[in-house]
């Protein structure tokens, strides 16, 4: 992967302190704490090995769902070079990501469920469980049944998830 940058040359997510780094995408984001969108390049045969899942009635699947699956088997070479210059639109996907996740709840829940089951730092595991429960409230099924997938985190997770869900609903309807 390479860096993405704004047209003014500023790296999205900030500058990095390596020239090259070989690790999987999960370690890159969660253990090394590298932020921001990157310009990932994958071999076609690897992407064919990990197709994007399709969910009935949904038009979006988080790229991270597929990229995390790839990360379980493959490393990426991360290179400190800006090759992709872009701007984020005020009404683009990034600006509307919460609404998109609410509307495409099956894909969102698959992403958070799989991430939770991976070997990730505990703080990230708690955040992931919160987001799983937050978006489970958007699911057109027995929501509490989904909550109890992770009962060990319930006392921490559920109240925060409910607060975030209420905030999401208020923001989406503004």
What is each model feature region?
Residues 74, 115, 136-140:
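Generic structural signal for hydrophobic core residues of well-folded globular domains
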Residues 78, 98-102, 128:
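Preference for long, solvent-exposed alpha-helical segments and helix-linker "stalks"
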Residues 125-135:
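Structural register within alpha-helical repeat arrays
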Residues 60, 123-126:
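Alpha-helix N-cap/helix-initiation sites
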Residues 71, 84-89, 96-122:
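Catalytic core of nucleotide-sugar-dependent glycosyltransferases
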């Amino acid at each position: 992967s390479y860096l993405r940058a704004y047209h003014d040359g500023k790296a999205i997510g900030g500058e990095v302190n390596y020239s090259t780094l070989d690790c999987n995408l999960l370690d890159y984001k969660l253990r090394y704490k590298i932020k921001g969108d990157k310009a990932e390049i994958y071999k076609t045969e690897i992407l064919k090995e990990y197709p994007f899942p399709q969910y009935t009635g949904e038009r979006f699947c988080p790229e991270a769902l597929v990229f995390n699956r790839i990360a379980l088997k493959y490393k990426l070479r991360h290179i400190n070079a800006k090759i992709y210059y872009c701007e984020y639109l005020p009404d683009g996907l990034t600006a509307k990501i919460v609404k998109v996740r609410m509307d495409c709840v099956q894909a969102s829940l698959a992403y958070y469920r799989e991430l939770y089951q991976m070997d990730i730092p505990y703080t990230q595991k708690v955040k992931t469980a919160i987001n799983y429960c937050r978006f489970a409230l958007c699911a057109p099924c027995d929501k509490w049944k989904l909550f109890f997938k992770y009962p060990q985190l319930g006392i921490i997770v559920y109240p925060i998830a409910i607060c975030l869900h209420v905030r999401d609903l208020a923001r989406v309807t503004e």
